[in-house]
Amino acid sequence: MVYSYTEKKRIRKDFGKRPQVLDIPYLLSIQLDSFQKFIEQDPEGQHGLEAAFRSVFPIQSYSGNSELQYVSYRLGEPVFDVKECQIRGVTYSAPLRVKLRLVIYEREAPEGTVKDIKEQEVYMGEIPLMTENGTFVINGTERVIVSQLHRSPGVFFDSDKGKTHSSGKVLYNARIIPYRGSWLDFEFDPKDNLFVRIDRRRKLPATIILRALNFTTAQILDLFFEKVVFEIRDNKLQMELVPERLRGETASFDIEANGKVYVEKARRITARHIRQLEKDGIDRIEVPVEYIAGKVVAKDYVDASTGELICAANMELSLDLLAKLSQAGHKQIETLFTNDLDHGAYISETLRVDPTSDRLSALVEIYRMMRPGEPPTREAAENLFENLFFSEDRYDLSAVGRMKFNRSLLRDEIEGSGILSKEDITEVMKKLIDIRNGRGEVDDIDHLGNRRIRSVGEMAENQFRVGLVRVERAVKERLSLGDLDTLMPQDMINAKPISAAVKEFFGSSQLSQFMDQNNPLSEITHKRRISALGPGGLTRERAGFEVRDVHPTHYGRVCPIETPEGPNIGLINSLSVYAQTNEYGFLETPYRRVRDGVVTDEINYLSAIEEGNFVIAQANSNLDDEGRFLEDLVTCRSKGESSLFSREQVDYMDVSTQQIVSVGASLIPFLEHDDANRALMGANMQRQAVPTLRADKPLVGTGMERAVAVDSGVTSVAKRGGTVQYVDASRIVIKVNEDEMHPGEAGIDIYNLTKYTRSNQNTCINQMPCVNLGEPIERGDVLADGPSTDLGELALGQNMRVAFMPWNGYNFEDSILVSERVVQEDRFTTIHIQELACVSRDTKLGPEEITADIPNVGEAALSKLDESGIVYIGAEVTGGDILVGKVTPKGETQLTPEEKLLRAIFGEKASDVKDSSLRVPNGVSGTVIDVQVFTRDGVEKDKRALEIEEMQLKQAKKDLTEELQILEAGLFARIHAVLVSGGIEAEKLSKLPRERWLELGLTDEDKQNQLEQLAEQYDEMKSEFEKKMDAKRRKITQGDDLAPGVLKIVKVYLAVKRQIQPGDKMAGRHGNKGVISKINPIEDMPYDENGTPVDIVLNPLGVPSRMNIGQILETHLGMAAKGIGEKINAMLKKQEEVAKLREFIQKAYDLGDNVCQKVDLSTFTDDEVLRLAENLKKGMPIATPVFDGATEKEIKELLQLGGLPTSGQITLFDGRTGEQFERQVTVGYMYMLKLNHLVDDKMHARSTGSYSLVTQQPLGGKAQFGGQRFGEMEVWALEAYGAAYTLQEMLTVKSDDVNGRTKMYKNIVDGDHRMEPGMPESFNVLLKEIRSLGINIELEEE
């Protein structure tokens, strides 16, 4: 494998045995591709904004004299960039401008004669844009639109599985679900009649809809039944015989023909009898007259002479009717063929309960059902029915729906109209009846072929269309009202409804969520999440067990492990690593093609529907060098089941062992040795890890760490190769390689880094460069590490030396004992940044003022404020300190004469304002790292605001000037090269000032052209700089657009440093979570023979019952990795020659059985080997991919190489007594995470606080400064102890006895510690509640 210079700094030893056939795809593509589809111009108009416009336009006036046509649209440039939007709290969006054409037709002239055409570009609101990391900035906060898994449009056949009716009879139903429009359901009732429902309303006999479609009774019977023809000849009745129809019947008479008896009376007709009849070619037999009684006529029979109806279609025949028919000269009688086995008379029965007789009465019935209480007219009824399923405005199956519909009905073509046709409805009914008759299967609703993904783009398009439809109504009215000659398209369109619909979706839809920004993994997982909830989806309460369950089609598409615990389990899933959506929105997963038992490198993506027809081998099947299966029988999946197949039968093979899991689960090493429940917790808890101060790469990883770190967007990645020209904490400058440059550019890339910003979860986002000056860079190399990344690899926690042993009960019930060394070394210290805002409003009594002049506040409290009343940057503040001084005017109170006198004497004016300053919340202490002041346009800026503005201008100028200088230097270097190659001496050039170089002329024409091109570019660059500077200045100095009534907003950012402490929650990656019980002095921790103490002591009893053995294997492998690191460290300290070092490291990389990774250190220079060794001395990082990891044998070999016992256990000594422990203890390195459940955020005690309005009891919870609830069971406990006085004060003065508690306060102030309990308020509430039920209760005095 070829490594770039940067990748050679630290190479992770990979134990994977299977070669990587397919690179891991870009992990955020589901979001970015979907949104790209939404905003890019689509000439076909199949999706995105284009489709929405084309579906609504052209809009015609009611009279048809004019119409508004859509021409094209364009998105403008956003006003602010992403960072500015976050700071200012605005939405990152671009204006949408649409070109519309108003066409006015001549009134009297023939149709289509154009009188006037006006074209104009119209503003249609703002469209939020996606940032490059797949998020949206809405009102300054980053949000993610989660993809939705919903039922695909189309037709579904299902049954109630016998649950509806008490008899347990299975009732079948069919449902046509459009993308938008009314649902159409067909269902059987227990009596086997077929009913129809529209939009889940009252049911009607299904034949009503057929009558509404203009079918007559005879046509309906013709559609659904086969015919049996009886002939009357010579007063004898003959029946046309189709032998196959007789199977399974019992003969009610002797079946004979040509004098031969084929079946005797009362015998069952078998396949042998049928073969005999067919062989002899018998096509009609004589039947007794009674046989026809009870049969149903297929059409109307009329007496030709009188025109009288003898027998209507669907009537049962009797012997009388037969005689009448015979008299009227009808010799042939068509009846319906039905039997109880597989030709039920369902439609015939339904027609009997159908109250309607013709189209009109059917339409009226449907109208009454849809609009009860409205008088139906013929026109209204026709319109309603027409609009339900046959109008393109109201009904759309969509391309997906039509494809699914046609596939379900086994039609050949997959395209077609978006509305329903007569055939569609009748074929659905036919198929439903076939299923009831025992032919065909019901669909599995949880099959991923019947559920599809709706991503951002599609949902935004739907919302946009909703907005457009609202506008359409208004436009129609304007077109028919006004004076068209003076109207322009702009006057028709009101952008408000459109932007309101879009804003509502991005701001408050259930699927638009506040981004989980704890760490890079939680961001990536959030963007790849798939939810079955949301508008048009399921609800938590109604979702049954089946929907939540893992389905065989989830394989490779949806992760079976990662899903939340609790009420949402199984409803919110995560996309598998390699999964993607196809054009219809169904999930696909890649497979390698297998031909004649040989696995090729051809890769096909299959959806769940396509996959069902193939035999698919697992990724860990053994292959020889040519890719042929070694075993004759291979374990494969087919039609959702797993079994053995011969190698010739195999069609496909999995691409990778990680294919079935999501990104989160693929980061758990030895996942294959963990119980699924614990793996679920492990995958979920990794997302809650807080980025530590110093990120530390996991010693034992899975090889996915780099992909996650790079794709998440928290690192800075090189867009083009080159060399590092300049690097500091906030900027990296790369001089681009010649071959990657565009002609005529300076060839300089500048990467500005993010410094100490707040994330959505209040953790700290900070980037640090990880390249040095002069280093060669290749495209895709990581230049700067973000939060929780280390040299471009995800690093969520720290590698800790753990021992599995009990220690004095401090690790009882999953508690964790931690060494003080962990705190001293700041291993789990995290930085949290809080934003506190102070808003100054315009009140009725006058404006609030931000000032340092606050009434009744001492000097000390104001010591950290500047003269504007805003805290200094760098000030260390604690709970209760003032951050921003603010006073609010209060209403004039009536003054007593004494007060008036005092006022007159001392001139005190401050008492007409009250202090409403922003203070640090209790329990928080930290350092102020940033202050921002936003001032409304037209309000004078205070001194601090001007200072900040000045500083920002200075910084912007400095940045842009430096950028210009860097670009100029690059450009002049190229000019210099051109001039020297053109024959001018370098010495002479150095004497000329650089600006004059451009004036020189060259004889060589090509060179002169080059020079002119560069000169042109130089001018362009300078004017560009001026433009940028002007724009920057404008943005910084302009006032801010604040909410109505707000004059000023001051935002203060506090950085809080939190060390680990008892009560914090920690976890490993295998679901092994616990709370820190004690931080133990280093000298008391158990230590080994070398005197090295362990960092953490875990309880061994937490392993066997939880069955997450992965943590033990990780511990052993971590120990081996550390052992090898220590050996390398010893060699470096001894300053061994590079050859020895190279040999040892090579040995470590080569270890393992037929491992794929090949690292050839002979191609590395000595410097590169030394740098690699330097990065490996803390431990050699190891990758053990999911389901393809290190074996026990390999772990033992690695332990041996590191000079450690192969048992993985060592002798430990007690730190307090120095005595050896009885038996050896498992010690090793485990990757531990500190989770975002910190005791500081949870600890809370109430003093005096607010009370609930109704019950007058203290509120609950930290946010409300609430109390601890003394609940029902606690009361029982006190009752059981007989602690009457304690109980009394709990239920009265400490809770809701209003008078009692004020009296008690007064008593305590007076130094008298008695209490006088009264009536608890909750008792009054109870009385009121009983009275509200009409029962009068009164309290009587004794």
UniProtKB/Swiss-Prot annotation:
Gene3D superfamilies cross-referenced by the UniProt entry: 2.40.50.100, 2.40.50.150, 3.90.1100.10, DNA-directed RNA polymerase, beta subunit, external 1 domain, DNA-directed RNA polymerase, subunit 2, domain 6, RNA polymerase alpha subunit dimerisation domain, RNA polymerase Rpb2, domain 2
Gene Ontology biological-process entries: DNA-templated transcription
Keyword field: DNA-directed RNA polymerase, Nucleotidyltransferase, Transcription, Transferase
Reaction(s) this enzyme catalyzes, per UniProt: RNA(n) + a ribonucleoside 5'-triphosphate = RNA(n+1) + diphosphate
PROSITE patterns: RNA_POL_BETA (PS01166)
Enzyme class at the top of the EC tree: transferase
Keyword Nucleotidyltransferase: yes
Catalytic activity, EC: 2.7.7.6
A Pfam family this chain is assigned to: RNA_pol_Rpb2_2
Organism domain of life: Bacteria
InterPro entries registered for this protein in UniProt: DNA-dir_RNA_pol_bsu_ext_1_sf, DNA-dir_RNA_pol_bsu_external_1, DNA-dir_RNA_pol_su2, DNA-dir_RNAP_su2_dom, DNA-dir_RNAP_su2_hyb_sf, RNA_pol_bsu_bac, RNA_pol_bsu_CS, RNA_pol_bsu_protrusion
Keyword hit for Cytoplasm: no
One MF annotation (Gene Ontology) recorded for this entry: DNA binding
GO annotation, cellular component aspect: DNA-directed RNA polymerase complex
NCBIfam families for the chain: PRK00405.1 (NF001616), rpoB (TIGR02013)
Annotated function: DNA-dependent RNA polymerase catalyzes the transcription of DNA into RNA using the four ribonucleoside triphosphates as substrates.
Similarity field: Belongs to the RNA polymerase beta chain family.
HAMAP family per record: RNApol_bact_RpoB (MF_01321)
Subunit structure: The RNAP catalytic core consists of 2 alpha, 1 beta, 1 beta' and 1 omega subunit. When a sigma factor is associated with the core the holoenzyme is formed, which can initiate transcription.
Name of the protein in question: DNA-directed RNA polymerase subunit beta
Name of encoding gene: rpoB
